[in-house]
């Protein structure tokens, strides 16, 4: 393995059970790049810095970042993959009609309200590599129907895009959080290292930032 294969090859071997072809390898690497970093504002990146600044070791700070992953941040991939896979044989219009009152995982973003650029980049990469992009196309169809029914745009977000790539590559939906963390932990380590190099004291909220309820 050490002589002949890359880290990406080993990810496929351990999580799918076989080695990838070159196109599969390229798409997974693109997905991992898309997930690695999206600004200090993300909970999985600033929380490790707070923990590191409090005097903790690298592994403790990294663990805090992992625990920051939840249904509202990085943790919707599994549900999005399950949703896309469960409904892939249905028409997008019928799916949205059935779930119009639900929060459909993998759609909508706090910042990218008109469209997540990471989603578009992964879709274009998959297309260029020759993948059928069945799950991407289904996701975009749901996006259009959501806009029709709700009157506002809820774009396929990065969680939905990662879900589409995972399914395209034949991975189990339950690996969603694992893939996000495989990528994100690199950025976590970078931020923790940077924090450890600072001479600042630990972070503490100012009294004006705390709302007291009487």
Regions found by a protein language model. Give the residues of each.
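Non-transmembrane, aqueous-exposed alpha-helical and coiled segments at domain scale
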Residues: 1-214
């Amino acid at each position: 393995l050490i002589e002949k294969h890359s880290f990406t090859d080993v990810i496929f071997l351990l999580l799918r059970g076989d080695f990838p072809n070159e196109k599969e390898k390229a798409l997974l690497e693109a997905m991992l790049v898309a997930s690695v970093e999206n600004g200090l504002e993300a909970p999985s990146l600033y929380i490790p810095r707070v923990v590191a600044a409090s005097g903790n070791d690298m592994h403790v700070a990294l663990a805090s970042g992992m625990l920051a992953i939840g249904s509202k941040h990085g943790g919707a991939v599994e549900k999005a993959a399950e949703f896309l896979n469960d409904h892939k044989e249905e028409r997008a219009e019928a799916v949205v009609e059935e779930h119009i009152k639900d929060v459909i995982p993998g759609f909508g973003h706090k910042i990218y309200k008109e469209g997540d650029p990471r989603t578009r980049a992964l879709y274009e990469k998959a297309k260029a590599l020759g993948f059928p992009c069945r799950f991407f196309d289904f996701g975009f169809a749901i996006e259009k129907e959501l806009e029709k029914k709700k009157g506002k745009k809820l774009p396929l977000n990065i969680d939905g895009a990662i879900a589409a790539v995972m399914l395209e590559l034949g991975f189990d939906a339950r690996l969603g959080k694992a893939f996000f963390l495989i990528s994100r932990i690199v950025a976590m380590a970078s931020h923790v290292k940077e924090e450890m190099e600072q001479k600042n004291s630990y972070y503490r909220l100012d009294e004006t930032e705390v709302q007291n309820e009487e």
